[in-house]
């Protein structure tokens, strides 16, 4: 039985993880990290705390859907004598956070993914193949999320853009375009555009388009419920609990 710690249990995905663990036969919720008062009930026996060390000591595997600074503090505490397998789904991370993730992965297994769904994992492989095969096609990526999402573009959109850039042997920072306005001239052939839309309660929609003269190809993934992210994260946690120290992605956990 995997004892799961949910870090960021009051968030949208965190709440779903708590719900999911209440009925799972092979894992149980053992510890929960929160910074504010809970407005929902926890399963009997679950430890609720705002202390990083206590939280880590109360579980075997951690699933983190929180905020960048909280993720950084979690990683730092884990590296100070409290290593645990860490599944990190927090988005909006910067270079400092990624350095911490790489450093932590030397001491414990760490799985980082901007999206935990099986569909997006497949999509990522498909767009990599398409970007390489359709070398002279223009790439445009559009992501849409609910009005409350704080980071833009989405982590998933950036992951997809990075996959396309790697397929073409270029650095994303050198070719990425995140908006167009005014008399900017013609589109440069090497551009990889990443555009963001916000509105309503959309869980997540990503469109990756490859456009040429006479034809175009579009890949679309739509998440109709955030529960798909929770299920993917729990599946990843069960897999990660058996792994050695190192840095992993969701494709590793899914075996694709």
Swiss-Prot record:
Tagged with keyword Cytoplasm: yes
GO cellular component, one term: cytosol
Reaction catalysis annotation: (S)-2,3,4,5-tetrahydrodipicolinate + NAD(+) + H2O = (2S,4S)-4-hydroxy-2,3,4,5-tetrahydrodipicolinate + NADH + H(+); (S)-2,3,4,5-tetrahydrodipicolinate + NADP(+) + H2O = (2S,4S)-4-hydroxy-2,3,4,5-tetrahydrodipicolinate + NADPH + H(+)
Associated pathway: Amino-acid biosynthesis; L-lysine biosynthesis via DAP pathway; (S)-tetrahydrodipicolinate from L-aspartate: step 4/4
KW NADP (keyword) present: yes
Record: active site: 145 (proton donor/acceptor), 149 (proton donor)
Enzyme Commission number(s): 1.17.1.8
EC category: oxidoreductase
Binding site for (S)-2,3,4,5-tetrahydrodipicolinate: 146, 155-156
Subcellular location, principal: cytoplasm
Alphabetically ordered keywords of this record: Amino-acid biosynthesis, Cytoplasm, Diaminopimelate biosynthesis, Lysine biosynthesis, NAD, NADP, Oxidoreductase
Residues annotated as binding NAD(+): 8-13, 89-91, 113-116
Location within or outside the cell: Cytoplasm
A molecular-function term among this protein's GO annotations: oxidoreductase activity, acting on CH or CH2 groups, NAD or NADP as acceptor
Binding positions for NADP(+) per the UniProt entry: 36
A Gene Ontology biological process term: diaminopimelate biosynthetic process
Any single Pfam family the record assigns to this protein: DapB_C
Stated role: Catalyzes the conversion of 4-hydroxy-tetrahydrodipicolinate (HTPA) to tetrahydrodipicolinate.
Stated family: Belongs to the DapB family.
Name of this chain's protein: 4-hydroxy-tetrahydrodipicolinate reductase
């Amino acid at each position: 039985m995997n004892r799961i710690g949910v870090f960021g249990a009051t968030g949208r995905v965190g709440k779903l993880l708590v719900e999911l663990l209440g009925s799972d036969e092979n894992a149980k919720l053992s510890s929960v990290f929160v910074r504010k008062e809970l407005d929902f009930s926890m399963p009997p026996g679950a430890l609720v705390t705002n202390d990083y060390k206590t939280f880590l000591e109360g579980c075997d595997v951690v699933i983190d859907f929180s905020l960048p600074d909280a993720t950084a503090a979690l990683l730092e505490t884990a590296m100070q004598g409290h290593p645990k397998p860490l599944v990190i789904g927090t988005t909006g991370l910067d270079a400092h956070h990624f350095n911490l993730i790489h450093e932590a992965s030397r001491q414990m297994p760490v799985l980082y993914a901007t999206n935990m769904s099986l569909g997006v994992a497949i999509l990522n492989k498909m767009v990599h193949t398409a970007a390489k095969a359709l070398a002279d096609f223009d790439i445009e990526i559009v992501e849409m999320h609910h009005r409350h999402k704080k980071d833009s573009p989405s982590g998933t959109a950036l992951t997809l853009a990075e996959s396309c850039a790697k397929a073409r042997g270029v650095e994303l920072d050198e070719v990425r375009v995140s908006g167009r306005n005014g008399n900017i001239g013609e589109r440069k052939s090497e551009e990889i555009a990443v555009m963001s839309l916000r509105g309503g309660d959309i869980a997540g929609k990503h469109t990756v388009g490859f456009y040429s003269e006479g034809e175009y190809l579009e890949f679309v993934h739509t998440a109709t419920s955030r529960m798909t992210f929770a299920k993917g994260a729990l599946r990843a946690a069960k897999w990660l609990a058996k792994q050695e120290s190192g840095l992993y992605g969701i494709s590793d956990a899914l075996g694709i």
